[in-house]
Amino acid sequence: MLNRLEKGDEIEIVAPASYIEDREKFNLGIEILEKWGLRINKNFNLNRKYGYFAANDRQRLSELENGQNNKLIIFAKGGWGSARLLENDPKWKNSWMIGFSDTCSLLLSKYAKGYLGSIHGPMITTLSEEPSWSLQRLKNLLFEGFVEDIFGEPLIGGIAKGDVIVSNLTIFSYLIGTNHLPDLKGKIIIFEDVNEDIYKLDRIFTYLRMSNKFDEIIGLGFGNFFKSEVNNSEEKNLLKNLIHERFKKFNIPIVIDLPIGHSNGNACVPIGFDSTLNGNNGTFSVNL
């Protein structure tokens, strides 16, 4: 377990991908962290743009590496561009680093290279949209070193105990064949994504089956894949049936509808820590 945060600690905001469009959400995210007693490095330049990125690759990589000198990096937003930084093999350190969606490429790379601190969770521009329980969960993790159980819908029974990896599904699939994807043997894997067509998800699931990457995982979870307005739609049932059909052959516990991802709360999960996924009752717990 890395050092816990304390009031007065300075933290770093890094934009490894797209530039900031919604300044209001950015500022609201800052306010939340400042209310927790954290000091924000004010060097972040909201006006900087380089095409559709927050800066050029060299600048973004430098800020990512230097930001690790603080206890915590929280990413500003996703979009696209994080994976471009992996071409230059970032110099990682053991420090907390929070993000999701596109920035999962960085979270996974850091863990794959043997460093702790990757947290799949809200970013600056999404913090203000989080329900109170999700914000409290993140605060508990960073300041107190614990998180409570979360719950989903059990799909295939069984209990898995092992280190957990959480990622955006699409980003995870793009890292197959690179040295930035962690070893999956004995791991619990949890995926999130947003508003992908069902045939595209089928394509990725089939690719994962064919890649043999799932032959040695011990549990599988799925977070939010749709925005809230379609949570009870036919598309959700199609996805549930697709997950069952594509992954039942692995004979591992599977839980769906965990509150992780782009809607309904994005429960933070520290990557690489011992966890339990219960496919009998839908519970997921992290053992810190």
Where are these regions (language model features)?
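ATP/nucleoside-binding phosphotransfer catalytic cores, i.e., glycine-rich phosphate-binding loops
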Residues: 224-288
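ATP/NTP phosphate-donor binding region
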Residues: 1-69
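Conserved beta-alpha junction segments in alpha/beta enzyme cores
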Residues: 24, 163-194
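Internal helical hairpin/lid segments
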Residues: 183-239
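Conserved anion/nucleotide-ligand pocket segment
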Residues: 115-177
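Short acidic/histidine-rich motifs immediately flanking catalytic phosphotransfer sites
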Residues: 67-72, 216-217
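N-terminal glycine-rich "phosphate-gripper" loop used for MgATP/nucleotide binding
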Residues: 71-82, 100
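Short, acidic/small-residue loops that bind anionic groups at enzyme active sites
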Residues: 90-110, 117-124, 253
